[in-house]
Amino acid sequence: MIRKGFVMQVNPDCHAEYKKRHDEIFPELVEELKSHGAHHYSIFLDKQRNLLFGYVEIENEQRWNDVAKTAACRKWWAFMRDVMPSNPDNSPVSQELEQVFYLD
């Protein structure tokens, strides 16, 4: 498995809404993520900095990147655009992190 870490931001007044939307995540998005090889996907919130830390294990970089091409993902991005900084294509502004330590 390939471990991926990344950070995003959530708007300061949208913490509860961000969580609520993820509690009610689109079932079709869950299926797309799983079918594209995503496992152990978690997102953590640092409320003081409005920072989101994402962690996911993937089977293959290409399959992971292909999730962004799915209708379910595009629909989710559009749905989330008002609660977080987003790019012109509605994808969340994110920064991939470099792994500097791992303990198995």
UniProtKB/Swiss-Prot annotation:
Pfam family, one: rhaM
Keyword Ribosomal protein recorded: no
Residues where substrate binds: 18, 41, 76-77
Class of the enzyme per the UniProt entry, highest EC level: isomerase
Any single Gene Ontology cellular-component annotation: cytoplasm
Domain of life: Bacteria
InterPro entries linked: Dimeric_a/b-barrel, L-rhamnose_mutarotase, Rham/fucose_mutarotase
GO BP terms: rhamnose catabolic process
List of catalytic residues: 22 (proton donor)
Cell compartment(s), UniProt: Cytoplasm
Catalytically driven reaction(s): alpha-L-rhamnose = beta-L-rhamnose
Assigned EC number: 5.1.3.32
SUPFAM superfamilies given in the database record: Dimeric alpha+beta barrel
Similarity field: Belongs to the rhamnose mutarotase family.
Subunit structure: Homodimer.
Function recorded in the entry: Involved in the anomeric conversion of L-rhamnose.
Annotated protein name in UniProt: L-rhamnose mutarotase
Species the sequence originates in: Mannheimia succiniciproducens (strain KCTC 0769BP / MBEL55E)
Higher taxonomy: Bacteria, Pseudomonadati, Pseudomonadota, Gammaproteobacteria, Pasteurellales
